[in-house]
Amino acid sequence: MKNRRYEVEILQIEGIYQSDPTTIFNQLCNKKKCTLLLESAEIDKKHALESMIIIDSALRISSLDNIVTIEALTENGKSLLFKLDLLLPLTVKNVLFENSRRLIFPFINHEIDEDKKLRSVSIFDTFRLLIKTMKIPKNLTKSMFFGGLFSYDLVNNFEKLPILNRNQKCPDLCFYLAETLLILDHKKKNCIIQSSLFNRKSSEKNRLKKNLQEIKTKLTQNVPKIEHRKIDQISLKCNLTDKEYIKIIKKMKQSIKKGDIFQVVPSRKFYLPCISSLSAYQRLKQSNPSPYMFFMQDSDFTLFGASPESSLKYDSKSKKIEIYPIAGTRPRGKTENGLIDLDLDSKIELEMRMNEKELSEHLMLVDLARNDLARICEPGSRYVASLTKVDRYSCVMHLVSKIVGRLKSNLDIFHAYCACMNMGTLTGAPKIKAMELISKFEKERRGSYGGSIGYFTESNNFDTCIIIRSAYVENNLATVQAGAGIVLDSVPQEEANESRNKAQAVIQAIIYAHSSREVV
């Protein structure tokens, strides 16, 4: 059977611009599964830049270990399955179902050299081949828009790491191929709604046209209030007490003294009920505006957060790839009534900038980011664009830097992500040894925490953030995970305090959204 490649047809209309994407998401998606809200804001001024909402998904792509599951959610998406069948290499076993495919990939050979391993057949080929099923229209971006998450544990498919318990339903990766995408440009104050047609069926085209008009009409109607359900008391629990966490930190410092590692990032989990996730996200966004904000509504879980830290960013026009390491954290300087004390805040910043431990930790991670880019960038193209800048958020301030390089012409964004995961600010250095140590002491999969969320397109544009300052919600229970970077000079109690400070913005947002008083 010949694989006939059709051009993606984009159906597009303009809607009424609204400044709050969260209320639009509530109006158009409500509790619809496989929907995603991505927001971005300026780091310094916190002004909104662009927001994107996947209103309808054509496909849901998820993986666990070496098995990828592709679910067609519409007839439009289903047409891509048949095209994909004809492109799969013989080394990939394809199990066919009426509305889905289960792809079983060969395990990575760990005995071959790093470059060959990077280019081996892998679960990332699912995305490469899906993009190849269609001709891409010229001068149109986002005609194939994939939004979703890569979990921290995805790295286990590519590196020999300990096998850990899986206590949550979070897959190794979970992405949606957008069928209907809403794009808000907050600078131009416009709203574009577009649908991607992946076949030539007139019935599907008419369905998408009708859907676009219905969405446009909905945007003119009264906006429903975001659900706000009260919980009288919230019990906040943690999987590790300060005493237990400090004990782990001390043991990890022994590994640093032995020379096994230079740095490591142990984490702990805070648990609390959350039945109004979108309300909690809205509160988090208001109290802690960040460069990356996200709300992912899956069939198995909800994930929301406001992350300060980019994971990997790639611009296909300039070929530039960026990493934005954050290391060095202090609480904001506040008065007794919770307002920012500018004088105290500046003193805390100065202390952080002059602190030898914070600077050595930060520069170590800058070097690690440079080494990550060295594997995938053209020789001589790497440079440090900014060094030890301070970014401020509601509860904490951070030391940040930016490292830039030009991606090699024979590599793509998936090679780049594979080479760089997981980011050193969530693992430590050397990465593999640090991740082994994390597995030994944390004893369970991290799931979404420390992975990344964002989007990529058919043109290779790629923008993701590290999943921190976030809540993973499953069965109405939120898990808020936070860690601290440990080096030789670390003071264990201070690191325990830091992990709690990092979790506070999300915990407070959840408590506020449910109008509750915290019970520790």
From Swiss-Prot:
<dbReference type="InterPro" id="IPR005257">
    <property type="entry name" value="Anth_synth_I_TrpE"/>
</dbReference>
<feature type="binding site">
    <location>
        <position position="469"/>
    </location>
    <ligand>
        <name>chorismate</name>
    </ligand>
</feature>
<dbReference type="GO" id="GO:0004049">
    <property type="term" value="F:anthranilate synthase activity"/>
</dbReference>
<keyword id="KW-0057">Aromatic amino acid biosynthesis</keyword>
<comment type="subunit">
    <text>Heterotetramer consisting of two non-identical subunits: a beta subunit (TrpG) and a large alpha subunit (TrpE).</text>
</comment>
<keyword id="KW-0479">Metal-binding</keyword>
<keyword id="KW-0614">Plasmid</keyword>
<comment type="function">
    <text>Part of a heterotetrameric complex that catalyzes the two-step biosynthesis of anthranilate, an intermediate in the biosynthesis of L-tryptophan. In the first step, the glutamine-binding beta subunit (TrpG) of anthranilate synthase (AS) provides the glutamine amidotransferase activity which generates ammonia as a substrate that, along with chorismate, is used in the second step, catalyzed by the large alpha subunit of AS (TrpE) to produce anthranilate. In the absence of TrpG, TrpE can synthesize anthranilate directly from chorismate and high concentrations of ammonia.</text>
</comment>
<dbReference type="InterPro" id="IPR015890">
    <property type="entry name" value="Chorismate_C"/>
</dbReference>
<dbReference type="Pfam" id="PF04715">
    <property type="entry name" value="Anth_synt_I_N"/>
</dbReference>
<comment type="pathway">
    <text>Amino-acid biosynthesis; L-tryptophan biosynthesis; L-tryptophan from chorismate: step 1/5.</text>
</comment>
<dbReference type="InterPro" id="IPR019999">
    <property type="entry name" value="Anth_synth_I-like"/>
</dbReference>
<feature type="binding site">
    <location>
        <begin position="328"/>
        <end position="329"/>
    </location>
    <ligand>
        <name>chorismate</name>
    </ligand>
</feature>
<dbReference type="Pfam" id="PF00425">
    <property type="entry name" value="Chorismate_bind"/>
</dbReference>
<dbReference type="InterPro" id="IPR006805">
    <property type="entry name" value="Anth_synth_I_N"/>
</dbReference>
<dbReference type="GO" id="GO:0046872">
    <property type="term" value="F:metal ion binding"/>
</dbReference>
<dbReference type="InterPro" id="IPR005801">
    <property type="entry name" value="ADC_synthase"/>
</dbReference>
<feature type="binding site">
    <location>
        <begin position="291"/>
        <end position="293"/>
    </location>
    <ligand>
        <name>L-tryptophan</name>
    </ligand>
</feature>
<keyword id="KW-0456">Lyase</keyword>
<feature type="binding site">
    <location>
        <position position="40"/>
    </location>
    <ligand>
        <name>L-tryptophan</name>
    </ligand>
</feature>
<comment type="similarity">
    <text>Belongs to the anthranilate synthase component I family.</text>
</comment>
<feature type="binding site">
    <location>
        <position position="361"/>
    </location>
    <ligand>
        <name>Mg(2+)</name>
    </ligand>
</feature>
<feature type="binding site">
    <location>
        <position position="485"/>
    </location>
    <ligand>
        <name>chorismate</name>
    </ligand>
</feature>
<dbReference type="GO" id="GO:0000162">
    <property type="term" value="P:L-tryptophan biosynthetic process"/>
</dbReference>
<keyword id="KW-0822">Tryptophan biosynthesis</keyword>
<keyword id="KW-0028">Amino-acid biosynthesis</keyword>
<feature type="binding site">
    <location>
        <position position="449"/>
    </location>
    <ligand>
        <name>chorismate</name>
    </ligand>
</feature>
<keyword id="KW-0460">Magnesium</keyword>
<feature type="binding site">
    <location>
        <begin position="483"/>
        <end position="485"/>
    </location>
    <ligand>
        <name>chorismate</name>
    </ligand>
</feature>
<feature type="binding site">
    <location>
        <position position="498"/>
    </location>
    <ligand>
        <name>Mg(2+)</name>
    </ligand>
</feature>
<protein>
    <recommendedName>
        <fullName>Anthranilate synthase component 1</fullName>
        <ecNumber>4.1.3.27</ecNumber>
    </recommendedName>
</protein>
